[in-house]
Amino acid sequence: TLSRQTLDADLRYYQRIATTGVLALRFRGFKSYGAYPDFLYFGGNSEMRGYDYLSFVGQNSVFANAELRFPLIEAALTPVGVMGGVRGVFFANLGGGWFKDQGYSFATSKAETVTPITGYQTDAAGNLLQDSSGNPVAIYGSPQTITGFRLKDGRASYGFGLETFALGFPIHFDWSWRTLFNTAWEDQVFASSGGSATFRKPRFAVWIGYDF
């Protein structure tokens, strides 16, 4: 008997735009099941820009990327020699990962009332208080009814970047913004860390690696 079965699909499409631009699309779907299922870690870099590296994990995972790539400078003469051209990119990402029986909901438009966690109780020394199970004791805010489309457990981001070759390595400079497509929902989900305003703050990242 097999201890695990895994399906992993990676679909890509490239469309030339004018003479030097490229529209690049990718979809990856991963599912593993059995007594000892595999897990897929992803996030950051070219997979889910704006989120921490490998911050998504699950035996079920999906993510999609769309990128518009276009040249800005064909080549550059620098004090250390000729560098590769500089390319611009606009990107958007959508995805999520989850485990079996987790109760995962990628997105919804249904109205629901939620009670946000606004923080956690601490003692006089500033240490987190724990309940009998060892979990932090939460502080709850007032219930709020949320309406409209939003990502529940799914995540998305968008932004722009610059790419170049330096000393033989592809280097990326990205500016990205995270979103769940609903600021009222983000205010509840991230109430303990500053709400939507903090979640949507631009994030800058530098990474080395090839595009998909």
Description of each model-found segment:
Residues T1-F212:
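C-terminal transmembrane beta-barrel domains of outer membrane proteins
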